[in-house]
């Protein structure tokens, strides 16, 4: 939300209106869009307590709390469901969750696919009683959908939920780090989940940058990374369309093949 507001403010002099932004949520299995922000209306931002979110609860932040305060998390609404479509948020056991509780997003409606071509196993896994299991985590508040991340990407350390995108975005703001080319994921260390960071950066003082990343992650998320890999520019894998291949850095790390400027 901060970047969107900054963009709208910068180009307001040229006649740009913030209401031109149309946040939405969708996927190919639903013939793209599932929810859409009403045209011509200002975007809706939810300000929640960051600590509560670690427990899966989108509790409203204290009134008057500064948006830049680490205890406050802002999420942009992805809009409301299209007519004839339904949303449901469920727990790991499939129980329907109340508003402001984070769970897996399910949807059903006339645009949802009946299944995957010649892949019955994938169809059975994704579609149950007509409900498409999206694999995305989110919550609903006042009819609006808020997306938090991917279920399979969720990092759970000491019982607290951490969304890798939040960690990656924060690290990406550090000088020298290539924004959008940061990956946070968890690995098993002696039976416990541990955090690993891989970040592309310009060649320089990798040791100092690791310390900056360690401080940032500790101060904002209360976590201590087990390993921080400073990777040369262009080494972290992406798809042909520029999307992050989130599984690849984890696989490279586990195989000991993640290229680095220098070893720790």
What residue ranges belong to the model's regions?
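Conserved AMP-binding/adenylate-forming
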Residues: 2-144, 152-154
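Extended hydrophobic secondary-structure segments that form protein cores and membrane-embedded regions
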Residues: 21-25, 105, 197-199, 228-231
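A short beta-turn/loop motif at secondary-structure boundaries
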Residues: 26, 187-191, 234
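Residue-level signal for well-ordered, solvent-exposed loop/turn and beta-edge residues enriched
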Residues: 88, 95, 144-146, 160, ...
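AMP-binding/adenylate-forming catalytic core of the ANL superfamily
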Residues: 109, 114-115, 120, 125, ...
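Conserved C-terminal "lid"/linker of ANL adenylate-forming enzymes
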Residues: 181-185, 196-197, 214-264
